[in-house]
């Protein structure tokens, strides 16, 4: 129940008309959770702990090797709802890098806003239909990428999605399957 309430609180912030930085988004979501569940505490300490956790998260085992293989074959970019410095530090902590890093902070809009995906199209210099966006959220990633004409894959490592997934959505379980999908699409 609390996890779903947190997810809804964050989604509400993503959908807000005016942009707020990722840290402020968390502050607003924590404040809403505190009020909803009658909690008290230090909001800044909660936010600091949440951000420390983002930096402790380790990439799945296949990520680095698959990205290294793919970058020899295609241009890679990351489109993220994280603030730029937090994302860059998380990537660095995992030994990962991308040619193009596009963040909601830079665009002042969260996924699924078309503008953040359009920025990726401009950076990559490719027609939208030649770009494949891979993400773990149907609403933020698949809907957003599809709205600007990109292809999309939904990654569901557990086999279950945090969002309802309509029929016809292309789903993979890991980045190895993404690599295989990309290679098959060239045949």
Model-derived segments and spans:
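N-terminal helical cap/lid subdomain that shapes the substrate entry/recognition surface
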Residues: 1-61
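Asp-based, Mg2+/Mn2+-dependent phosphohydrolase catalytic module
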Residues: 31, 41, 64, 68, ...
